[in-house]
Amino acid sequence: MTFEDDLQASVRTIPDYPKPGVMFRDITTLLGDARAFRRAVDQLVHPWAGSKIDKVAGIEARGFILGGAVAHQVSAGFVPIRKKGKLPHQTVRMAYALEYGTDEMEMHVDAIARGERVILVDDLIATGGTAEGAVKLLRQIGADVVAACFIIDLPDLGGAAKLRAMDVPVRTLMAFEGH
């Protein structure tokens, strides 16, 4: 069994959630398995071992869990990227595309200094709308987005390709065809 097969076995798939026809990939089972969680975090950060990374930005909500662990591994600070209205201090905001409409995300305006090297982290990349918005938000405040990391890629939906087209290297640990 390969690393990817082993990791995929730790992800629960729930058919027809949140709506009919969707195969929901639930990483809470991976997070609850200490060995799988550790291996996933180690593999996410492997390309940057020994590199200077200043901050890890995690997208709400599962990106907070993974981002905190990744930040610890690379000895970097952690920055939450949240839905609009959830942060108490002055923020910078970016609109992003959803399947049906738009939403906004934000981060504290002073969370990242211009030129800091940042890795963006979330659990899954599908269409890439949220991750694209996060990259734009980070670049708006002057961050150098070194990479975007995800446990799961749904390649048929094109999100990873969208980020690569923005000159952001993308690291994923497993792919599920279809959605």
Swiss-Prot record:
SUPFAM superfamilies, alphabetized: PRTase-like
Cell compartments where the protein resides: Cytoplasm
**EC number(s) on file:** 2.4.2.7
Which CDD domains does the record match to this protein? PRTases_typeI (cd06223)
- Catalyzed reactions: AMP + diphosphate = 5-phospho-alpha-D-ribose 1-diphosphate + adenine
- List UniProt keywords, sorted A-Z: Cytoplasm, Glycosyltransferase, Purine salvage, Transferase
What pathway or pathways are given for this protein in its record?
Purine metabolism; AMP biosynthesis via salvage pathway; AMP from adenine: step 1/1
Q: Which GO terms describe its biological process?
A: adenine salvage; AMP salvage; purine ribonucleoside salvage
Record's superkingdom? Bacteria
What class does this enzyme belong to in the EC scheme? transferase
User: A Pfam family name for this chain?
Assistant: Pribosyltran
GO annotations of cellular component type: cytoplasm
Q: Which InterPro entries match?
A: Ade_phspho_trans (IPR005764), PRibTrfase_dom (IPR000836), PRTase-like (IPR029057), UPRTase/APRTase (IPR050054)
- Assembly and binders: Homodimer.
Please report which protein family the annotation says this sequence is part of. Answer: Belongs to the purine/pyrimidine phosphoribosyltransferase family.
Give the protein's biological function. Answer: Catalyzes a salvage reaction resulting in the formation of AMP, that is energically less costly than de novo synthesis.
Can you name this protein? Answer: Adenine phosphoribosyltransferase
Organism field:
Nitrobacter winogradskyi (strain ATCC 25391 / DSM 10237 / CIP 104748 / NCIMB 11846 / Nb-255)
Its taxonomic path starts at: Bacteria, Pseudomonadati, Pseudomonadota, Alphaproteobacteria, Hyphomicrobiales
